[in-house]
Each structure stands twice: as structure tokens, then as C-alpha cells.
Amino acid sequence: MGRVPRVGIGGPVGAGKSMLIERVVPVLAARGYHVSIVSNDVISKEDADRMRASLATERGLLPEDLVVGVATGGCPHTAVREDPSMNISIIEEIEAGHPELDLVIIESGGDNITTTFSPALADYFIYMIDVAGGDKYPRKGGLGIESCDLLLINKTDLAGMVGADLGVMRADAERIRGERPFGFVNCMTDEGITEVAERIIHDALLGAPPGHPVG
């Protein structure tokens, strides 16, 4: 049996990565998928603690030990790209203790538009930016925006407040990414969240139902 599929989520500080996970996991859980979360940050495990409280302790969607925080102590992308050994070791331990797992979601610490995940760590890569950064963001390019499997543009409700044109962002994303998919989401209102979960099921899990190994 191969390893459990792994989805990496990267993006700048404050883009909404943790909230995306908090919104997507309930959709996956409602469809019967067993999910684990590994949340990286430089010096804190606060995001992991919040997700554990919200998803495990309060709602019982997964066991508490399936939400793990990793304080990397260094540059965020190092722990998910150049040297992912710490994350790999943690995930292998989780997999050994939970043979029912269908998916592991790995959150990178907030970083810049060059963030990517090592293929040794993640099988599918979601990169998230947000409208508050301005409508220039997609056309800046960068490895994260250009090469990810799915680009998400969050906080669509803030466009008018920051003078961002969603039409410009859409056109630039289409030009920069070509045939690679992207989508607009609003994690506060769940706009686009079901579609993200369906992308994960179709593309990362290859449509496999819960309890069935991929491949």
C-alpha cells in the first residue's frame, strides 16, 4: 500500500490558509473522508491549536491527535521544500497510528510567491493569495502562483474596499496559469469551498471514495 495522499497549502501570511482548512475539512468529513492536518509556523503552534479546538475538540470531526503543529524555527519554505524531513517524519508517524486516513493536509508557514512544496512531501499543491494584496498579485507570477496545482484567490468581499478589480485578477490568472485551474473563494462566507473540496477529491484523491487507497 502506498502512502496516504498529501495536499500542501502555501501562501503569504494572512492569506487565509488556516481558515481554508477549517472550511474544507468539514466538507470532506461530511463525505466520509478521514483527514489529518499538519500546520507549520516559524515559532508558534497557534494555528494548529485553533484548528484542533475548532475541528476536533468542539466539533468532533477528527481525533485531536490528527492536528499537529510544527514550529520550524526557520524560513517557512525550508521545512516544506529544501528539507521536509521533519514534516515527513511526523506524517509517517501519524499514518502508522491511523491506518484509516484518507488524506493529510500540510499547511506551510506564511511565505512569499516563490513558495513550493517538495514532491517528497506533497502530492498536490494549493497556493492561496488574497484580494487585499491588490489586483496586481496574480500577474506578479512566481513559482507558487505559476506552478501550483490549484491557485485560490481569497477575500473577494474586500475588492471594493482596496480598489481591486476581480476581472483584472481573473484575466491575469488565466494568462499566467494557462490551462492550470484557479478559483475565487471567500472563506468567511464559504464561497467556493465546496468546489475546493471537490477539486481535492477529484485531483488529489483521484476520485477514490473514503477508505480506498489511491492508485
Swiss-Prot record:
Keyword annotations: Chaperone, Cytoplasm, GTP-binding, Nickel insertion, Nucleotide-binding
Location in or out of the cell: Cytoplasm
Any single Gene Ontology cellular-component annotation: cytoplasm
CDD domains the record matches: UreG (cd05540)
A single GO BP: urea catabolic process
InterPro entries: CobW/HypB/UreG_nucleotide-bd (IPR003495), P-loop_NTPase (IPR027417), UreG (IPR004400)
Ranges in coiled-coil conformation: none
Primary location: cytoplasm
A GO MF label: GTPase activity
Ligand binding (GTP): G11, P12, V13, G14, A15, G16, K17, S18
NCBIfam families named among the record's database cross-references: ureG
Family membership noted in the UniProt record: Belongs to the SIMIBI class G3E GTPase family. UreG subfamily.
Oligomeric and partner information: Homodimer. UreD, UreF and UreG form a complex that acts as a GTP-hydrolysis-dependent molecular chaperone, activating the urease apoprotein by helping to assemble the nickel containing metallocenter of UreC. The UreE protein probably delivers the nickel.
Role noted for this protein: Facilitates the functional incorporation of the urease nickel metallocenter. This process requires GTP hydrolysis, probably effectuated by UreG.
Protein name in the entry: Urease accessory protein UreG
